[in-house]
Design a protein with these regions (language model features):
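Structural marker of alpha-solenoid helical repeat scaffolds
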Residues: 13, 46-47, 64, 80-84
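TPR-repeat structural position
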Residues: 34, 67-68, 87
Length: 107
C-alpha cells in the first residue's frame, strides 16, 4: 500500500488533523495532482493557521493555476512564520512571492 493510500485510509477512519492533511497535500503535489493537493492543504491550514509549511506548500500547489491565491497563501504563511520566529520559512515564501510578482509584471 502506498503512502497516499495509507494516509487516505487514516482519513477515512476518522483521523483528521493538520499533519495528516499536510502529508496528503504533499503526496498529491508530488504525484502531479495539484488540485487534490490544494484541497488537503487548505484543510491543513484550517486546522492550524500557524502551520507555515502548509501555507508554503499551498502556495506552490496554487502557483500555476491560481497565482493570486498563491500570493495570498504565501502572505499568510509569511505572517504565520514570523509569528513563530521561523525566519527561514518566511524568507523562502518572500522569495516565492517576489518571483511571482515579478513574473506577473512581465506578462
Amino acid at each position: 500500500m502506498s503512502l497516499t493510500e495509507n494516509l487516505e485510509k487514516m482519513l477515512a477512519a476518522g483521523t483528521d488533523n493538520a499533519l495528516l492533511r499536510f502529508g496528503l497535500g504533499n503526496a498529491y503535489l508530488h504525484a502531479n495532482d495539484p488540485e487534490r493537493a490544494v484541497g488537503h492543504l487548505r484543510r491543513a491550514v484550517e486546522h492550524d493557521p500557524g502551520y507555515s509549511a502548509a501555507w508554503k506548500l499551498l502556495g506552490k500547489a496554487l502557483e500555476a493555476a491560481e497565482p493570486a491565491q498563491a500570493a495570498q497563501a504565501w502572505r499568510s504563511g509569511i505572517a504565520a512564520a514570523e509569528a513563530k520566529g521561523d525566519k527561514q520559512a518566511a524568507r523562502e515564501m518572500q522569495v516565492f512571492l517576489r518571483r511571482l510578482e515579478r513574473g506577473a509584471g512581465n506578462g
